[in-house]
Amino acid sequence: MATAGATSRAANCSATFGKEKRTMSRIGKQPIPIPEKVKVDIKNHTVLVEGPKGKVTKTFAPVVNIAIVDNKVIVSPSEDSSRFAKAMYGTVRSVIAGMVKGVSVGYTKDLEIQGVGFKANLKGKQLDLALGYSHPILMDIPDGIKITVVEGTKLKVEGADKQLVGAVTAEIRSYYPPEPYKGKGVRIVGERVRRKEGKTVA
C-alpha cells in the first residue's frame, strides 16, 4: 500500500516531467535562424551544417520532420504524432541550434595542469602529456578539434562540435584527474576540487 509521502513524491515527479516536456515542446516550435555564412543541408534526417568554424554532421531518428523554410530550420513531430516524437522534437531542435552556433562562433574548453614536472606540448596531430608516469601519453587529436598549449600547463580545446569538444576535454582530464590532497593533475578551468587533509604519521 502506497504511503501519502510516496504518492506525493510520485505526483511531484509527474508534474516535473510534464513541465519539462511542455518546455521542450515550446523550444521545439521555435524556428532556428540560419546566419550569414552558414549553410544547412538536410538529407534523409541527416543534417550537415557548415560555417566559418567548420562543419558538423548528425543523423536523427525519423520521428521528427526537419525542413528549411524562409532561411530558418523548422523541426516538428512526424505524422504518427507518437509520444516519443512529441518528446523528441524539442531535443532535436536544441541539438541543431547548437550545431549552428558551433559552426558560427565555435565552442571552447580550457584546462590547466598542476604538478611538478607535469606539462603538455603538441607533436603534429598528437598531444604529448607528461603527467608523472614512466612514459609520456600521446593522444591523437581528432579532426575538427584544435588544441592550443600555452606555457606547457594551459590548454584550450576548440571545435564546432560541442559534443566532440566535451569528449576530448574529458579524455585529456581522465589521464590524471585532479587528486584531492595536493590538487595536482589535469582540471577544467573553474572546476572545484574538494580537498582532503593528508594523513599524519604519529
Each model region followed by its residue ranges:
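Short, Lys/Arg-enriched N-terminal segments with co-localized hydrophobic residues
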Residues: 3-23
